[in-house]
């Protein structure tokens, strides 16, 4: 019995070492100059510009205001993906600062950072617009009666919204409450 336990332990330990060795080999084989992920994103979304993304938003807003819910949902989905990609590209312009060590960041002067601040600000604005788009997609699906997609997008929208986006937070919360048939007054 002791031999079986001992052999089992040896086999288990050997298996764990093999898995560890495989993980180490994978991390060592990552090419820091590999741009395949970036090319994949560009292939998927193209290279968005401020103007093209603004046009997408305007189109989605017009469809939303005209209560063309299905078309608006699809337009906001395209817009949300593209404005998110634009936010990522703008944020990348500030990446050397964020990738720097704590000491290097601490020693970087404001005058050095000042030209990069608008990129970070615009990226944050794009993310905020993406968050709002997710709420609007959820509302569109709610209005079409597609509660599965409504819940999914409202859930993600609420996950992404910041606390200062109170109007959309409230709208999303109210839509979720209606779908879930949750009456705040009755729950008191």
Report residues per predicted region:
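Structural signature of alpha-solenoid helical repeat junctions
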Residues: 51-52, 122-129, 168-171
